[in-house]
Amino acid sequence: MVRLDLPWDLVDEILSRLPATSLGRLRFTCKRWNALFKDPEFITKQFHKAAKQDLVLMLSNFGVYSMSTNLKEIPNNIEIAQVFHCNGLLLCSTEEGNKTKLVVVNPCTGQTRWIEPRTDYNYNHDIALGYGNNSTKKSYDSYKILRITYGCKLVEIFELKSNSWRVLSKVHPNVEKHYYGGVSFKGNTYWLSYTKFNILSFDFTTETFRSVPLPFLYQDGFVTLALSVVREEQLLLLRSRFDMGQVGIWMCNKIDTETVLSWSKSFTLEFDSLRDLPVMSILRIFIEEDKKVIVVDCDDRWKENMIYIVGKNGFKKLSYEKDRSNLWRLPFFFSYVPSLVGLYPPM
């Protein structure tokens, strides 16, 4: 058998183009590769060069499960109540009695870091993970956690690098009107507003909340809005008129200013079968644009819990198991893009 020795620069270049899940399995091949996959410069290079994997994960029965591939490093010994995804990292809120703790996990590398809370608090809070877009710093060097208590009585920031909490004194008045469960886009977090007239954003660089207008004039009625992301490269907004059998999709791939997003209407689906969906509200959407298919996670507590895969030829439904300990606790679906991003400082 002939052994082929390639120049290390070429090996580095080849490996940087492989998906993160493949590299995660290769990290124990040799010590040099393992060290390379932990190198911040290689992590950044691989993140930008490799094709993004867009997986769907589900939070149900206090655990996170993969619906498309086996991520063995998802903790199965932690009761997870909330989860937020950013750059391949999962920020999880755990329940222990009436108290909660925070833990950041990279399912691809298996790294886990517990976050000590500033004070004891219960589970009535919203959480988000993001990073500052400072050109002098790498994103992995400036990850922060945002925590909003119920009623927005307290808003806190935790910096992973300094391992410290701070309280934000200036908070946007619309914060208390946001829907829990935001999405991460280019380091910032976005939520839909209760009023449905705008999107609420949090900029992790300036640590400020901002109100962002919708790309269309909102008209009340049988209208449902949902916010999601595509491979963390595009922000996705869905507007559905179930009474008319119509779904419109808007996409944003860049931020023009602090309060303006660059939206473009991607496509519209019209079909009679949409009227037959037993939908109270849409919780999450995922999209395969080339196939013009929308995967819809619906809130239908009175019937079976279903995922609806909607296309021009109708829809099909897939059932999933309810949380038997609390039938009102709906499974939470979210888009996940694996990465080698490390938890700094290493713990």
UniProtKB/Swiss-Prot annotation:
Name of the molecule in the record: F-box/LRR-repeat/kelch-repeat protein At2g27520
Record's keyword terms, sorted: Kelch repeat, Leucine-rich repeat, Repeat
Ranges: LRR repeats: 59-82, 152-177, 196-220, 261-285
Renumbered ranges of Kelch repeats: 138-187, 306-347
PANTHER family: BNACNNG10540D PROTEIN, F-BOX PROTEIN CPR30-LIKE
F-box domain: residues covered: 1-50
Pfam families associated with the record: F-box, FBA_1
CDD domains xrefs: F-box_AtFBW1-like (cd22157)
Organism whose genome encodes this protein: Arabidopsis thaliana
Family annotation (InterPro entries): F-box-assoc_dom_typ1 (IPR006527), F-box-assoc_interact_dom (IPR017451), F-box-like_dom_sf (IPR036047), F-box_dom (IPR001810), Gal_Oxase/kelch_b-propeller (IPR011043), SCF_F-box_component (IPR050796)
